[in-house]
Amino acid sequence: QLWNAHNPFRAVLLCADGHMVIWDYKNAPFLSCFNPLVREVRAGADLFYFDRGDKVDDAARAFAGEVSSLLAEHAPGLTRLAIDKPMLHAHWALAAAGFTITEGEEVTEKARAVKCPDEIRAMRCAVHACEAAMAGMEAYARTAIPRGGVTENDVWAVLHAENIRRGGEWIETRLLTSGPRTNPWFQECGPREIGTNEILAFDTDLIGTYGICCDMSRTWWIGTDRPRPDMVDAMRHAHEHIMVNMEMLKPGATVPELSAGCHVLRPEFQKQKYGCLM
């Protein structure tokens, strides 16, 4: 659940021998029954103030005690513990229990970098679902906006609905703007009514099917008039930028090679260019 992302009650311990323990909802151990990798289901990792109040430290010590017992059995003699997203009281309690806390996010990110065939198929499915959701939003925008009275929020709501319809989960941002609000970029969508013959731009930033993030950007011209010449020129330059950079993406390509050979935007597009290369 998204709620766990900002009120973390769930934790997973992966021991050196492969033994995996999950701390979950106290009365819902069945949530992990489908996963053969989970050997134990426990409760008690809800180490945040909303749940524990002034006794978070007591709960953290109890949690650290469970971790100590588990590792004594499944990783005897080992005291290094990599944690990716530690709650503060948990960090203190585990350190006090004698563990050497190390960076766990690097470990998990590098593990995610290796994709098995099922994960590749899941990614393709998620991308297809995202593209279908965008198509639904585009159909609504092109049909409804010319009638008038359609806001940025109205269009953005369609992407949410189409994502959920296909098994998606949530959307991280609200990056959809229209007309003059598209520049500078990074404003959130709002109640502005979108006019005809205006630009509509968005970035999906959605967590879609199988919990996979699909981050796609699109810019649409809504209306029957031709866009201004400077808009057409900017679009053509952006298309060239994408196509040149795509040609460099191939197995074995290194980051330094991509950095050295990437397409360079013209000077007038440098000031507000995006924060990443591609």
What are these regions (language model features)?
Residues 1-278:
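Active-site neighborhoods and metal-handling regions in enzymes and metal-associated proteins
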